Each structure stands twice: as C-alpha cells, then as structure tokens.
C-alpha cells in the first residue's frame, strides 16, 4: 500500500524527491532547484507528496490546490516500481483526499 506524505524541503524525503525530479523530467519541464524549493516551502497552495511503500521512497507528486480543482503538476516513480499499478493507486488516494476534481496533463511517451 502507498502512503502519501506531505513534505517540505526540510523533511528527510525531500532529497530523494529532488534527485528523482532531476532524472524524471527534462529541464524545460521543471523549475530551477531554487524556485522549486521556494514554492514548496512558501506557497500555501502548492503541495509536495512523498510516496512511500512499506517505508521505502518510491516517488513523488506535486499539486496545486485551488478552490475548484487540484492540478497534478509533476508525478514520478522510481524505475523499480514503474508499471506495477502505483500510479493508479496514487491517483485513487488523491481522489479520495480531495472533494474537487483532479486535473492532470499527460505527456506523450516520446517525452518519457
């Protein structure tokens, strides 16, 4: 089972989030490290979740929470767990957590 844990840059998992962020997304699809840290710590509408499975870090999700929807901005898992249904499980957990619709942007496989 996956656990969603809200984190900030001072939390232990954040270094793993930063590393995966840098390997899972090209530079043009992410903020600078400094800007990402700032929005994570200072913007009350921006949420970073570490994804843990049996106590091990397996990925992260970043979201913008608005009054009418939650926008899932970045979502990545470590290579070892890809294709094992974690993405569906995480989206289900997010849908249970929020009373407003989730909005996702899908990028084609050519970019993965």
Regions found by a protein language model. Name each.
Residues 1-35:
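Short amphipathic alpha-helix that is part of the acyltransferase structural core
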Residues 2, 46, 100-101:
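A structural micro-motif
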Residues 97-111:
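Conserved GNAT acetyl-CoA-binding A-motif
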Residues 77, 83-96:
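Conserved acetyl-CoA-binding loop-helix of GNAT-fold acetyltransferases
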Residues 50, 55-65, 69-76:
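Conserved beta-strand in the GNAT
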Residues 24-54:
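Active-site rim helix/loop that mediates acceptor-substrate recognition in acyltransferases
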